[in-house]
Amino acid sequence: MIHIYTDASSKDTTMYPGGVLRTTKVGIIVRNSNIIDVWFKRKEKFISSHEAEKQAILYSVAYVRSEYETNDITVHTDEKHLMQCKSIKKLIASGIRVEYVKGHCPGRKELKYKFNCLADWISRNGINTWRNYYYRHLLPQ
């Protein structure tokens, strides 16, 4: 089974000098407590956080289905309201499990993750930095 921990962040700071429009979406792909891949997308465009979270789930699942040729997937999200979306209901009907994780940052407990927003942190520091941090500090020794 593959687990996907999704997160997304939308920022509109154009009211400040040097402000940006940015949407970041990420899916951490885990098998047997090991990160096997990371799906990540950042655009210089603002969309609602609801839409960004939904896209993070849909695109991460599509990526795993094509790259790993499996439908044995559980998605972990911190957005409870997404369970009511038509596209997420279709995903569930197709056999994908979608679980709500209470609080910020799905995978925080499972991955012992200690930052508030996974997507923001990866956006600032890079995927490899996060992956190295995970393997060095967060995996049980």
Can you name each region flagged by the protein language model?
Residues 127:
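Residue-centric detector for conserved, function-critical "anchor" positions
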Residues 9-23, 43, 58-120, 131-140:
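RNase H catalytic domain
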Residues 1-51, 62-63:
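RNase H-like nuclease fold core
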Residues 52, 56:
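Loop-to-helix element that buttresses phosphate recognition and phosphoryl-transfer chemistry
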